[in-house]
Amino acid sequence: MANGVIPPPGGASPLPQVRVPLEEPPLGPDVEEEDDDLGKTLAVSRFGDLISKTPAWDPEKPSRSYSERDFEFHRHTSHHTHHPLSARLPPPHKLRRPPPTSARHTRRKRKKEKTSAPPSEGTPPIQEEGGAGAEEEEEEEEEEEGESEAEPVEPLPPGPPQKAKFSIGSDEDDSPGLPVKAPCAKALPSVGLQSDQSPQRSGSSPSPRARASRISTEKSRPWSPSASYDLRERLCPGSALGNPGPEQRVPTDEAEAQMLGSADLDDMKSHRLEDNPGVRRHLVKKPSRIQGGRGSPSGLAPILRRKKKKKKLDRRPHEVFVELNELMLDRSQEPHWRETARWIKFEEDVEEETERWGKPHVASLSFRSLLELRRTIAQGAALLDLEQTTLPGIAHLVVETMIVSDQIRPEDRASVLRTLLLKHSHPNDDKDSGFFPRNPSSSSVNSVLGNHHPTPSHGPDGAVPTMADDQGEPAPLWPHDPDAKEKPLHMPGGDGHRGKSLKLLEKIPEDAEATVVLVGCVPFLEQPAAAFVRLSEAVLLESVLEVPVPVRFLFVMLGPSHTSTDYHELGRSIATLMSDKLFHEAAYQADDRQDLLGAISEFLDGSIVIPPSEVEGRDLLRSVAAFQRELLRKRREREQTKVEMTTRGGYAAPGKELSLEMGGSEATSEDDPLQRTGSVFGGLVRDVKRRYPHYPSDLRDALHSQCVAAVLFIYFAALSPAITFGGLLGEKTEGLMGVSELIVSTAVLGVLFSLLGAQPLLVVGFSGPLLVFEEAFFKFCRAQDLEYLTGRVWVGLWLVVFVLALVAAEGSFLVRYISPFTQEIFAFLISLIFIYETFHKLYKVFTEHPLLPFYPPDEALETGLELNSSALPPTEGPPGPRNQPNTALLSLILMLGTFLIAFFLRKFRNSRFLGGKARRIIGDFGIPISILVMVLVDYSITDTYTQKLTVPTGLSVTSPHKRTWFIPPLGSARPFPPWMMVAAAVPALLVLILIFMETQITALIVSQKARRLLKGSGFHLDLLLIGSLGGLCGLFGLPWLTAATVRSVTHVNALTVMRTAIAPGDKPQIQEVREQRVTGVLIASLVGLSIVMGAVLRRIPLAVLFGIFLYMGVTSLSGIQLSQRLLLIFMPAKHHPEQPYVTKVKTWRMHLFTCIQLGCIALLWVVKSTAASLAFPFLLLLTVPLRRCLLPRLFQDRELQALDSEDAEPNFDEDGQDEYNELHMPV
């Protein structure tokens, strides 16, 4: 029985026998005769004769039908005659074809004449793709074998015994197939018809020489059943075993291969993977024929070159976009993949009732789903670095891997594949479908499963394992649906992203790679089947995602509905894991499934489990956020430790190398502008060298529409304070300086500072502290009978001297010692002054125009004037009208109306009405809008008198009869006393304190790292310019200016470009700031041109300016931590907010700190209200050593860090708070 087979049980007819001759006569030297005999044997006519003489099969005759059990018995029988494929392969040196000779051409021509007989009508000849047939190539190979006998063979290098090796390619296809004939073509579709297999041989048989030649070739490669079978050669890239191999198509998995013998494995490979002519499954495009011409000597060169130049895998982590698709039924009860959730950083779910996206939130996962996910990845298929570029190709390999890993049955192959290729729908499809929605029509199942041929676009190793056409109709997806094969399938090509959301696409980073999660219940599976896929490179799978983002990861989970697995929660779990930064970095760098399991364990270490108890109120979850922050901190520390250990080892982990380099470059390029050099004017020189080289770009960067919008916005933001402070300054100085002088000063100094300053984004202007100093100095000059404007000239000259000395000594570093303790006292004091001045002015209006039961006629106004003169301060010039009816009430209405409108628009900015940009525009123009509305109200009431703003006509001083544009330094009306020329150094030092604090703190706020200014700043240069220009202002009688904190921060925010690729729910991030000088020049120029609007400015009532003053004072208080702690004194401890100064400091010690600040404010208020009001800047400066020397003796460092820390970062959210709440500085 060695040459036959044992019949299977049941008395069935035996399988066809394969006869192999054991003894053959020796070979002769005549090669030509051998070729002739071989040509007669392989002639096409012989195939026709063999087929025609085969007895016909009678379908009515009863015969045995073989089951799978019979074939299994046949495969495992020890008597199965077997010829290994490796015995049929030509030696490696035969791959190099010798150049054709004349003798070979003659033999080929003679062979062609002999085999040109027409075949029989039974079976037409079947030729392979890529030429006129395979016969010529087989003939050439046999001729080469004959010629090689006479050629010397190079001896192989000594080494271990050669094992049996298998390969799929041109070599195997050109060699003779395995001579086995199966009884049923449907069960074994890979059976081929061979001339030597027929049980009835007709015609001339091959000569003994030809058969001996073949046998000698087999004997030269002895085969032993005990030869080892190298499983690594049967692995394909992306297989569950994780090892890349040269083969793309494998007959079985590793577990089955270990249980079978080498003969069975070889036979399975022949049946499943060989392309046997005669029983055609699909055309195999041979790489040798595609790449090079037939008979080309360099046919294999491109393949070898391509293998050598294999692309390096990209393991660099990218940004992530995750989409969860679930298998659902539509209205017509047809299955399709429906998007139910997505992740960019936080989870967004589709609301079932409204089909719209919900708000982003932190994903909450069940602990059981995480454990099931870990078990699924451990037991399921893991295909890493899969080299496929289409969804059908990926689906084919996923299904085959599921079959190999025994997750699904082979008969479920078609159903699972159809399920994976179903169409995908998204919530935005119906909205963006247009007039002609595209519904990709599905082809028949056979076309999808059988006609998907590998194309060169798939790459050299991108061949997809296909299924035979003759395996029968695939099972329907749903048993109740007879038309399941007409279900729409996912087909590549066409415009598949018609429903994409451009707004969502803007929020996804440019280099993001997507993860697709497919989960669902199917009725035809008996157990859940899962696969985790990582592609070798990201590919764009059309019609799969909502937006056109290349896909890198896929997770598939299918199973029956009767199991306890919650597929939705399991899909949410893997999607949340992939959106986690550390896990998706580990997924990029994973080499096998153990790395993925380790990453899941790391994720579980940083997760929180909440007990299953009812939570009533958010206050009960306060500890969760703090505990989570602590876990994240420990997690970052572990990652940092790993990076440090990796770096010490001399190499950097993939993905970490770039961050380390970037961090190092940032550290080296960072330049501290406040660092002292130790040389005279060293800081000034560094500022010039740092900032002026960017001067050309400061002009080019202004060519953008955003700069135009910023100019218009900041113009109104700068004009409103100029008018408000100008009107109040005219009141305080009795008209010596007013709106005209302040507008001119703002314009001139603004243009010069924008052109020469180191930080041109600063907006110079008048401020509340300078207004308080001007009032104090005016009262001092009136008390000493000195000329106010002449005294300001000498104060300005001394100011220049002190500024030069401070800049030469690099004194700008002192701004580091000004902590929020001093800033809050400063801002709180100025806010109180604004509020007090507002109601004080309103009181004066009610005094001048009281509410009387009977108002005298116009001729009796002089009597009323005499009666009320004692209550009014002495003034020069003609007095205004008195005792006007309804003036006080209308002034009150105008003041409160201006305040309420501006305050309401500020609150409206942070509301939920309209869009974010519209709210921000309305809120930013709140002050100009409130002024305009109240001016129109006053203009519409013509029978009531209100005091208006004093503005001259044209470019003129406020009081031409009192002063001119140039102020004589030696006095105008009388000589200025010499002692005052020297004593002016004291007020100059005081005004320097105010200018230094406001300018340097404002520059420090603008230069925060969070604002990402790239061109740098210059504290020394800016201070020198503002101080020197202050001396120029004294000579021309113009007010001193400083860097206005609120206006400067508003200017920077208006020029800030925010990143659009921000995950929903994440805080906004700055992309860049348009640092340039043109906007500052234009803003100052427009403010200067506003002097021609004198007729319009004269229509503004002073009561409207009082309302703006009240608005500035109230809004400044709302952003100061001191005011918040002041309210906590009257609040029970259980209602205190979760702030560091509350949770880390005892309540009574927190109140003690607040009381110390209130004591300093009270002392400054007392000094400001007395004759020594000029010295209040000096007392303000004393709060710095108080904080540095005294408070550390009363409080611990931990408490001071919580009470007096500058940890506030700029808020760029369109729904966030405005600049007043972010700053601790006065307006």
From Swiss-Prot:
SUPFAM superfamilies, per the entry: Phoshotransferase/anion transport protein
Topological domains annotated Cytoplasmic: 1-707, 906-920
UniProt keyword Phosphoprotein present: yes
Major location category of this protein: membrane
Biased composition (Acidic residues): 134-152
UniProt keyword terms in alphabetical order: Anion exchange, Antiport, Cell membrane, Glycoprotein, Ion transport, Lipoprotein, Membrane, Methylation, Palmitate, Phosphoprotein, Transmembrane, Transmembrane helix, Transport
Membrane-traversing stretches: 708-730, 736-773, 793-815, 825-846, 888-905, 921-941, 975-997, 1023-1044, 1078-1123, 1150-1186
Biased composition (Low complexity): 194-215, 435-448
Residue spans of biased composition, Basic residues class: 76-97, 104-113
Activity control note: Inhibited by 4,4'-diisothiocyanatostilbene-2,2'-disulfonic acid (DIDS).
Membrane topology listed for this record: Multi-pass membrane protein
Region (Membrane (anion exchange)): 708-1227
Omega-N-methylarginine: modified positions: R294
Span list, region Disordered: 1-256, 286-312, 428-497
Basic and acidic residues composition-biased segments: 58-75, 480-497
Keyword Glycoprotein found: yes
Positions where Phosphoserine occurs in the chain: S167, S170, S175, S198
Covalent lipid adducts (S-palmitoyl cysteine), residues: C1160
GO molecular-function term, one example from the UniProt record: active monoatomic ion transmembrane transporter activity
Domain of life: Eukaryota
Catalytic activity: hydrogencarbonate(in) + chloride(out) = hydrogencarbonate(out) + chloride(in)
Function per UniProt: Sodium-independent anion exchanger which mediates the electroneutral exchange of chloride for bicarbonate ions across the cell membrane. May be involved in the regulation of intracellular pH, and the modulation of cardiac action potential.
Family designation: Belongs to the anion exchanger (TC 2.A.31) family.
Protein name: Anion exchange protein 3
Species of provenance: Mus musculus
Name of the encoding gene: Slc4a3
